[in-house]
A protein has these predicted regions:
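Conserved AMP-binding/adenylate-forming core of the ANL superfamily
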Residues: 65, 82-138, 155-160, 215, ...
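Conserved AMP-binding/adenylation subdomain of ANL enzymes
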Residues: 268-286, 296-338, 352-355
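Structural core segment of the AMP-binding/adenylate-forming
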Residues: 138, 142-225, 336, 343-344
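AMP-binding/adenylate-forming catalytic core of the ANL superfamily
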Residues: 150-176, 190, 333, 340, ...
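AMP-binding/adenylate-forming catalytic domain of the ANL superfamily
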Residues: 202-207, 541, 574-599, 613-634
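Conserved ATP/PPi-binding loop(s) of AMP-dependent carboxylate-activating enzymes
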Residues: 425-429, 440-475, 514-516, 612
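Gly/Ser/Thr-rich phosphate-binding loop
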Residues: 308-311, 338-342, 351-420, 431
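Conserved pre-ATP/AMP-binding loop-to-beta segment of ANL
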Residues: 78-80, 204-205, 216-249, 256, ...
């Protein structure tokens, strides 16, 4: 009996029990029967939750790209691996077969080696959603270089911080990128970032917008001529199961971003397994995840998960609103997409527009529709189910994180009965628990608490690059012996889970996790600002938006408030990127603080939400009178 594909609900419960009672046997069988290895493992896994140390498939040898590409060539060589759908619908889509993907990855891998990149070197990739992004990632994995993809919407200082943190030797970028009807100068952003990055020796530049850019002699080279001269075969590097595959930065609730390290074998096994089961993938399906590859969703479910299963995956360069709001539906129709995976923020934005946009396309090819990035609200769930899925496609509402590597709690299409707004049941191997404030596990159903996971799984991030102590403190100290997700959750009467939102200082805006601390740091660097505090508040489209409470220095007191608000948002945009801009800025004379100097954020959250009913005990505040002042000045 295959463990790899769950067939029905009874089979799910059977597999889930097996995965919990005999995890070594369960994962051993899945890894053994579905992947190509140079050498099998000595032990399936060993772990220490106190020290936050995890090893999976110990001493196994493999290369993930052989599993993504080479092993498919005999049977699926001419099958389309990647469909590239450009920003402009008038530009022709590209269909890249597995044979072509092999040749292009081999050439790119040879270029990297020729440029002095070796196993273990870090390479920063700052590219738009074009084929070169996927190919450069796979080329790094081919030669054992560690890829660190930075979302191409981040500012130069955010790029520099990420490059410096993991000491990248090379940057791969493009002359520019398209976003709707705008062209963006990516190379200019990289040039600015690299003024502060001493470790970068080489920059490879792909052509996308064909704009004039500065090329620094000795450092910058156009990519295409190098690829033209490279051989189209390449021997893959033999990697250890626990060798790092990539670093991906996620917002910290405190200070600098965290470089999550994912290693090779466990990540491979778990992303392949979850892709197959959550989306009920079958041969010849066309899978489209609308995320950017710069986020974990793109790594796991545009690239690695689909290719490991020999699937056809869509890479979409555009945005849902260009040239108009029918673009997603037009792409589904054009490429006969069978599984569609997007974010609630996109669903809400599209639901606001005329139904004509979606109704002019039959969307008969769709079998499964999915949601990712944040909990989906009931109204959006029903709109998505009714108008996109035609009430015949299961809605898989997936919960997971950058740190988890793959989907953790989700309905399995055609297996798990769905319930609006619920992520439902855990995947095999995942043991969620709810914890109370006294660190006790909450038993039974119809309860809420802090969501933790009490046993490791193959694709758990192994550490924060260069800072294992921070990794331990962030994820394993709040509830010793358990992984703390930072999310709150509710377990209903049948054991289904519903994510209720963050319980730390991270706000999810349009599906992006934004730590409040880095945004506050950016605001506080403005010469007119003394101090600031950021909280989230509900937003119809974005799910949450950011509300800033700002105290001005004396020098800023007489400044025009509208101009100051614009400058503050520009400051945030320059330091972090446009995604972190504030929707509302309220200038205040003080912030509610405890006697130890801690800002009482729950009060600010309530004010931002317009809920003045119960601020709880404010006698512990140093300045309780400030609460009324802030409340009265609410925007």
């Amino acid at each position: 009996m295959s463990y790899y594909k769950i067939t029905d609900l009874e089979n799910y419960f059977k597999m889930y029990k097996k995965s919990v009672r005999e995890p070594r046997k369960f994962w051993d069988k899945i890894a053994d029967e579905n992947f190509t290895w140079y050498q099998k493992w000595d032990k399936v896994f060993e772990f220490d939750m106190q020290e936050a140390k995890f090893e999976w498939f110990q001493n196994a040898k493999l290369n993930i790209t052989k599993n993504c590409i080479d092993r498919h060539l005999a049977k699926r060589g001419e099958k389309t691996a990647i469909i590239f759908e450009p920003n402009d619908p008038k530009e022709e889509a590209q269909h890249i077969s597995y044979n072509e993907l092999y040749a292009r990855v081999a050439k790119f891998a040879n270029v990297l080696r020729d440029q002095g990149i070796k196993k273990g070197d870090r390479v920063c990739i700052y590219l738009p959603m074009i084929p070169e992004l996927a190919i450069s990632i796979l080329a790094c994995a081919r030669i054992g270089a560690v890829h660190s993809v930075v979302f191409a919407g981040f500012s130069s200082s955010a790029v520099a911080a990420r490059i410096n943190d993991c000491e990248c030797k090379m940057v791969i970028t493009s002359d520019g990128s398209y976003r709707g009807n705008k062209a963006i100068d990516l190379k200019g952003i990289v040039d600015e970032a690299l003024e502060k990055c001493p470790t970068v020796e080489k920059v490879l530049v792909a052509k996308r917008t064909n704009t004039n850019v500065n090329m620094k002699a000795g450092r910058d080279q156009w990519l295409q001529p190098l690829l033209d001269d490279a051989m189209n075969t390449n021997v893959a590097e033999i990697m250890d199961a626990e060798d790092p595959l990539f670093i991906l930065y996620t917002s910290g609730s405190t200070g600098k971003p965290k470089g999550m390290v994912h290693t090779t074998a466990g990540y491979m096994v778990y992303t392949a397994y979850t892709f197959k089961n959550v989306f009920s993938y079958e041969e010849n399906d066309i899978f489209w995840c609308t995320a950017d590859i710069g986020w974990i969703t793109g790594h796991s479910y545009i690239l690695y998960g689909p290719l490991l299963n020999g699937a056809t995956t869509v890479i979409f360069e555009g945005v849902p609103s260009y040239p108009d709001f029918s673009r997603f539906w037009e792409v589904i129709e054009k490429h006969q997409v069978t599984q569609f995976y997007t974010a609630p923020t996109a669903i809400r934005a599209l639901a606001k527009e005329s139904l004509d946009y979606v109704q002019k396309f039959p969307l008969q090819s769709l079998k499964v529709i999915g949601s990712v990035g944040e909990p989906i609200n009931e109204e959006a769930w029903h709109w998505y189910n009714d108008h996109v899925g035609g009430k015949k496609c299961p809605v898989v509402d997936t919960w997971w994180q950058t740190e988890t590597g793959g989907i953790m709690i989700s309905p399995l299409a055609f297996v798990t009965p769905t319930k609006p707004t619920y992520a439902s049941l855990p995947l095999p191997g995942i043991q969620p628990v709810l914890m109370d404030e006294k660190r006790n596990e909450i038993e039974g159903n119809q309860v809420t608490g802090s969501l933790c996971i009490k046993y490791p799984w193959p694709s758990i991030a192994r550490t924060i690059w260069g800072d294992h102590q921070r990794y331990k403190e962030t994820y394993f100290s709040a509830f010793p012996g358990k992984y703390f997700t930072g999310d709150g959750a509710l377990r209903d009467e049948v054991g289904y889970y519903r994510i209720t939102g963050r319980v730390d200082d991270v706000v999810i805006v349009s599906g992006h996790n934004l730590g409040t601390a880095p945004i506050e740091d950016a605001i506080n660097e403005h010469p007119a600002v003394a101090e600031s505090a950021i909280v989230g508040f509900p937003h119809d489209i974005k799910g949450n938006a950011l509300y800033g409470f700002v105290i001005l220095k004396e020098s800023g007191e007489n400044r025009d408030r509208d101009n100051l608000s614009k400058e503050i948002n520009q400051h945030i945009s320059d330091h972090i990127g446009p995604i972190a801009k504030l929707d509302k800025i309220q200038f205040v004379s003080g912030l509610p603080k405890t006697r130890s100097g801690k800002i009482m954020r729950r009060i600010l959250r309530k004010i931002a939400e317009g809920d003045f009913s119960n601020f709880g005990d404010i006698t512990t505040l140093l300045n309780p009178e400030i609460v009324d002042e802030i409340k009265d000045g609410k925007i």
